[in-house]
Amino acid sequence: MARVKGGVVSRKRRKRILKLAKGYYGAKHILFRTAKEQVMNSYYYAYRDRRQKKRDFRKLWITRINAAARMNGLSYSQLMHGLKLAEIEVNRKMLADLAVADAAAFTALADAAKAKLGK
């Protein structure tokens, strides 16, 4: 029986990695070893940043809500507490969208929170 050297399998494996590394800078899209390392790092970055994105958006929403709340004479924490007391269940994403797009609706929510806080 003839010896099989596995050239087809090796080429397929290298080709797959180099295809994933397409568009990378410098040797990282040409040389197999550096491409493999960069692809592995890319998977790590993608995994990490999918979680980071959730934190970043939450921070952005809170910043926008805080700015709009202060324009209505409340701090962020006072607004959120007042909304909870008023049993208004609006998530931060929706609140931030209201703060940017519909200031009148946000003011109505802020007034409801103020009423429950006794301000």
Swiss-Prot record:
GO cellular component assignments: ribonucleoprotein complex; ribosome
Gene for this chain: rplT
Molecular function GO labels: rRNA binding; structural constituent of ribosome
PANTHER family: 39S RIBOSOMAL PROTEIN L20 (PTHR10986)
Assigned protein family: Belongs to the bacterial ribosomal protein bL20 family.
InterPro entries for this protein: Ribosomal_bL20, RIBOSOMAL_L20_CS, Ribosomal_protein_bL20_C
Sequence intervals crossing the membrane: none
Keyword set, alphabetical order: Ribonucleoprotein, Ribosomal protein, RNA-binding, rRNA-binding
Protein name: Large ribosomal subunit protein bL20
Function: Binds directly to 23S ribosomal RNA and is necessary for the in vitro assembly process of the 50S ribosomal subunit. It is not involved in the protein synthesizing functions of that subunit.
Gene Ontology biological process terms from the UniProt entry: ribosomal large subunit assembly; translation
Stored Gene3D superfamilies: 6.10.160.10, Ribosomal protein L20
CDD domains given in the database record: Ribosomal_L20 (cd07026)
